[in-house]
Amino acid sequence: MSKGPGPGGSAASSAPPAATAQVLQAQPEKPQHYTYLKEFRTEQCPLFVQHKCTQHRPYTCFHWHFVNQRRRRSIRRRDGTFNYSPDVYCTKYDEATGLCPEGDECPFLHRTTGDTERRYHLRYYKTGICIHETDSKGNCTKNGLHCAFAHGPHDLRSPVYDIRELQAMEALQNGQTTVEGSIEGQTAGAASHAMIEKILSEEPRWQETAYVLGNYKTEPCKKPPRLCRQGYACPYYHNSKDRRRSPRKHKYRSSPCPNVKHGDEWGDPGKCENGDACQYCHTRTEQQFHPEIYKSTKCNDMQQSGSCPRGPFCAFAHVEQPPLSDDLQPSSTVSSPTQPGPVLYMPSAAGDSVPVSPSSPHAPDLSTLLCRNSNLGSPSNLCGSPPGSIRKPPNLEGIVFPGESGLAPGSYKKAPGFEREDQVGAEYLKNFKCQAKLKPHSLEPRSQEQPLLQPKQDMLGILPVGSPLTSSISSSITSSLAATPPSPAGTSSVPGMNANALPFYPTSDTVESVIESALDDLDLNEFGVAALEKTFDNSTVPHPGSITIGGSLLQSSAPVNIPGSLGSSASFHSASPSPPVSLSSHFLQQPQGHLSQSENTFLGTSASHGSLGLNGMNSSIWEHFASGSFSPGTFPAFLSGPGAAELARLRQELEEANGTIKQWEESWKQAKQACDAWKKEAEEAGERASAAGAECELAREQRDALEGQVKKLQEELERLHSGPDPQALPTFSDLEALSLSTLYSLQKQLRAHLEQVDKAVFHMQSVKCLKCQEQNRAVLPCQHAVLCELCAEGSECPVCQPSRAHTLQS
């Protein structure tokens, strides 16, 4: 979380002693600033009370939800003092409950959630520049919509001072101002620059980009906690969320750690179990200052206001540098009679550029400059990196050419990690062009590789044209040529093409390299190559016009180049299977002293040693085979005798190998079909298992429901048996098992019930008919009410006839 300016380090405009009364007057506030100062988190959210607030998680609501989030409005009284201090915290305030014994009249600062009372105080709100950038909507990427710090000069406001602070400032203004105190009387923008100038004066190396990239926020701040007054200008970390692992000691990617960052919020780095050994970023600082992302995007503050408060500690680019052009020499530096070569501007100790001629004895080695701070030391470092490598292109910031402010390519408004394989390959190609133009390479590395490539050349010379093995070997030799530094060559007549140009992708991960590795495992002695060459040497006589292929001589004259046909670029786009012609006749006119004897043997001819085809092979070889009358895949006419039989056997073995490969492909297809069938059966079995599981779950739920019903019925039955009104008595054996006190209680209950039953019987006898005992009694003509109407019709009154009544009663 960004730190606001400290109590003594906040940006403010100085007030002279005569203007104290004027400063105490109420200053006008912008409408948005006034709204936040007056209403932010001062009232409870009405929607949260109804559980309808949608800004609770994450908590971004303008109003407070809990008491510990409540903020008191800061007010400056008529006497010039604040209603509560903007710096001194209350020791009685409970941060959990949000209650203070002195209530709102407490003269000290309450540490509410987010420290809102201090951040949105009249003294500090929007008086300092935020160190974090803004998103597309203009909101702070760290603190969100309610950021208490200014984003640009237009968002700054002048602080409101307490009368006591003004008096202290007047006292300091009378000649006792220190370096720290001088920051008090500056504007917000000047204060931030003053802080940066202070730290740069203590350690000038912070002005170097490489030093910032390697050391920024990697060491803890030496000042006590919460007493560092430099704020965002401090290059040291103050907590774990601000810490950055040194990229020199720890290797990690530019992607955030999923255990630390959830959504847009960075959590505690301690939640990651891997700790410092994690391969991902743990803090926003680590991600912004990662070597892959650092200075890869333009600074928003520089685009909006033309200045950045973070200065050299900003992770974004401040100066747009022109990209490296294809031709490293601009038009203004073309060689002239008065200017024999390109003029280089070398950085001096004073920081400016000094022109140095390449022929000057003080001119440094250009290859050393090109390879400084990069991996251009060897060709393997250039071409051996596999696709997808996160290594950035070599940096060429050590050389400055006329008309260019720098050679380091600057590209902005791109997502982090935009260095794809194709762009890396393009940068490698540009760097090779730079080396080829500035300093001729030695041919020793290429000549050292000839013994390794010689067996493959011999294999190429004895195999028929158009065979798969021949094309594989030619492709592998192409890869070998591409892996060596480019040799000096004349400018081709075809624009935009270079015979020494590198392949676009590193050659270590191509199909040719795989075949080349397979050929390294072959023993060429098994093919009888030595005997075949011996036969050729004995049966042929070399002459000046003959062509050498892998040490063997072919009785044929050297090819003749047709004038005017070399300027066309049709050979580069030809769709025919014939090999391409040579690139340019300029190669034929080069002195032979440029190439070593081993390289002449490798290229295959002494007359046209510099003429290379598209694939890096000698074009005269292809012209010789193309001029023949045989088709691809047939044997040349010069091959006869035992060598032809041996080649026929080799070709038969190759065909058998191809047939075996086809059989393996068929077997693989059958296995794949069987695997697909098994996979389908497994999916169906899984679906059936899922359906059975669902049915089992349904049956389990039904069983649980029935068990619940049985349990309820048992409880109801027990309640009936043990309740105050038992419906049935236990058996005699059960009574004996009861205790005497329980029996007494049961007897008492039964007697009470018996009395109730007697009363009910007596009542029913008094109202029911004495004869049927079902219908209610009716008044008879004799004025007696003992029988019902039905019984009175068929019988006489039992009262009038006592004997009858006695009979009925009995």
Swiss-Prot record:
The keyword Glycoprotein does not apply. Gene3D superfamilies: Zinc finger, CCCH-type. The keyword Nucleotidyltransferase does not apply. Residues 586-602 have a biased composition (Polar residues). It is found in: Cytoplasm. GO terms for molecular function: mRNA CDS binding; zinc ion binding. A zinc finger (RING-type) spans 766-801. The modification Phosphoserine is found at S240, S374, S378, S385, S631. GO terms for biological process: cell morphogenesis involved in neuron differentiation; regulation of translation. GO terms for cellular component: cytoplasm. It comes from the Eukaryota. Residues 643-723 form a coiled coil. Keywords: Coiled coil, Cytoplasm, Metal-binding, Phosphoprotein, Repeat, Repressor, RNA-binding, Translation regulation, Zinc, Zinc-finger. Residues 10-19, 329-343, 569-585 have a biased composition (Low complexity). Residues 241-253 have a biased composition (Basic residues). A zinc finger (C3H1-type) spans 84-113, 124-154, 215-241, 251-285, 293-321. Pfam families: zf-CCCH, zf-CCCH_11, zf-CCCH_UNK, zf-CCCH_UNK-like_4th, zf_CCCH_5. Residues 1-24, 239-265, 324-343, 569-602 are annotated as: Disordered. Belongs to the unkempt family. Sequence-specific RNA-binding protein which plays an important role in the establishment and maintenance of the early morphology of cortical neurons during embryonic development. Acts as a translation repressor and controls a translationally regulated cell morphology program to ensure proper structuring of the nervous system. Translational control depends on recognition of its binding element within target mRNAs which consists of a mandatory UAG trimer upstream of a U/A-rich motif. Associated with polysomes. This is RING finger protein unkempt homolog. The lineage of its organism: Eukaryota, Metazoa, Chordata, Craniata, Vertebrata.
